[in-house]
Amino acid sequence: MIKERLDSLRELMKERGISAYLVPTADFHGSEYVGDYFKCRCFMTGFTGSAGTLVVTLDDAALWVDGRYFVQAEKQLKGSTVRMMKMGEEGVPSLEEFILAAVPEGGAAGFDGRVVDSAFGRKLERLLAGKKASIKDQEDLVDLVWKDRPAMSAQPVWILKEEYAGRSAEDKLAWLRDTMKKEGAGVHLLTLLDDIVWLLNIRGDDVRCNPVVLSYFAITNDQAFLFINPETLNQEVRDYLNDLKVEIRPYNEVYDYVKSLNNQKILLESGCVNYAMLRSIDSSNEIIDQMNPETLAKAVKNPVEIENMKKAHIKDGVAMTRFIYWLKKNIGKIPMDEISVEKKLDGLRMETEGNLGLSFDTISAYGANAAMCHYSATEESNTPLQAKGFYLVDSGGQYYEGTTDITRTIALGPLTQEEKEHYTLVLMSMLRLGAVKFPYGARGLTLDYAARQVMWDRGINFNHGTGHGVGYLLNVHERPVGIRWKMVPERMDSCVMEP
């Protein structure tokens, strides 16, 4: 099936003179998790991980994945004719190198410009120019192959009350206009979904587990435009947006709006704007390229959000405690497998007061499957739980009071000596990270070292981040917070610890 899809794509590429076609894991907004409509890479490869980039040439296909997905990709790509490229490993070409080698002098690479970030697109553009080659980005070729593609999500929009948001949308818009004025910007373009809904205090359900709304937003000193499917707005939300003096426009009209801008100073974050959007901006405009002000403001939680998040974690902790008690009481007594246990936890969480769903798909992994950082149990991989070894569960919920993310590794019975040692090392890592004191201005590199040192001393490591930011009734992974080498922690940031 995968081979047939790839061959169909290659026929379309030949007709258009394209030698290499890029299929990322992305929507039009650079979201980490995407709705079913945007799962083109999964459709073309069979790989279900949440990150990965496919490149198809006329005689080859390769998927780039990071260390979280090496084990999973190896399993899921078997028999697909798609090769795995382990990002960061010695001898593995970069995406750009692979594409450049596949495109002949005067040839062309292709992709849907709406799902490729502008930074990558411009870099590839410069590299291809050296071969007098071009980019064809006006057409979504996977759409022509995917005959039964799901419709784009259009879930109802709802208003997040100030008792939960802690700050009114009026106040946020006034603050944003003041910020624009200080930066000398006349227009600000927003394409990141979590930034938009945070700014307007609205939520939706257009991305699974992420309460966001498919939309774009533009604001000037005296106007504001929300580009959205109007069918998602009831009268209450329309009146609310009208009171905020936000004009509603159809979702796809954003490109016409951007093309109409002339001689403006436009504030945007180019790394978060798609290639097609950036190419739509007329050269008469000046771009003020910096991190979106909303991104930084959203990361620092206000006092109301902090207090509410404590309540959310207590609620979530009760559900987790009930689950762990049930698991330990019944292991070995009743049949259990990864999927049935996952459903048990999801049910306990969703019956909690104020729960609005999961914050990500639960990772329920027994034994060797727990080595896959973002493992997802399927009917084929579903493994029975036994009264021995480790069971890992990584899960979280969405509540009016906030977003949660918790991982636990549970001993179901006797352990090997190696399992005991590794568990103890991870525990030591957690304790060191939780206890470390650091001066303001210390970067994430310092904290990352504190967490990893006990493992490095024994010659082992883990191939994923040590911690990430968490949104408030938003994305479970929220930038720019994280235990990473350049990140400087701020007071009131919300960050997980997960060595």
Predicted regions and their residues:
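Active-site neighborhoods and metal-handling regions in enzymes and metal-associated proteins
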Residues: M1-P499
